[in-house]
A protein has these predicted regions:
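Helix-turn-helix repeat elements of alpha-solenoid scaffolds
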Residues: 28-45, 76-89
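Generic signature of intrinsically disordered, low-complexity segments enriched in small/polar residues
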Residues: 36, 51, 72, 77-79, ...
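Alpha-helical junction/boundary sensor with strong preference for TPR arrays
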Residues: 43-51, 90, 94-101
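Domain-start "cap" segments at the beginnings of catalytic or binding domains
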Residues: 5-8, 12, 37, 41-47
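Small-residue hotspots
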Residues: 8, 15, 83, 90-93
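Amphipathic alpha-helical repeat scaffolds of TPR domains
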Residues: 2-27, 51-74, 99-110
Length: 110
């Protein structure tokens, strides 16, 4: 697994953790919530300008970015524009993907 794929999968994991924070009945601490929001948004912004070298890699990256941007509460003024750009990229890559779980997951978030 290359570096971009591992970074995208890590962002997916963090965004999932943020989305489901507290669902297990555990208390939500504000410092944990704020740290996760900041970490997810910083990772999104660091991956935003990158492109996958294959359609699967690009799809995983788009999925991670959509998960991350939708999970965070922070916005420094460019989040909606970035989300639209990722959606445009996702629609381009969806046409190239074969039927797969990755394609279904990406369609779900589009």
């Amino acid at each position: 697994m290359n570096n971009l794929t591992s970074r995208a999968l890590e962002l997916q994991r963090l965004a999932h953790e943020l989305i489901y924070l507290g669902v297990d009945g555990e208390p939500i601490y504000s410092d944990t919530f704020c740290r996760l929001n900041k970490d997810v948004l910083l990772q999104c912004d660091s991956l935003f300008l990158l492109r996958g070298s294959t359609s699967d890699e690009e799809a995983n990256l788009c999925l991670a970015l959509l998960l991350g941007y939708n999970a965070t509460i922070y916005d420094y003024g460019n989040k909606e524009r970035n989300k639209q750009s990722v959606l445009d990229r996702a629609f381009e890559v969806l046409e190239q993907l074969p039927a797969s779980l990755l394609k279904v997951r990406l369609l779900t978030y589009c």
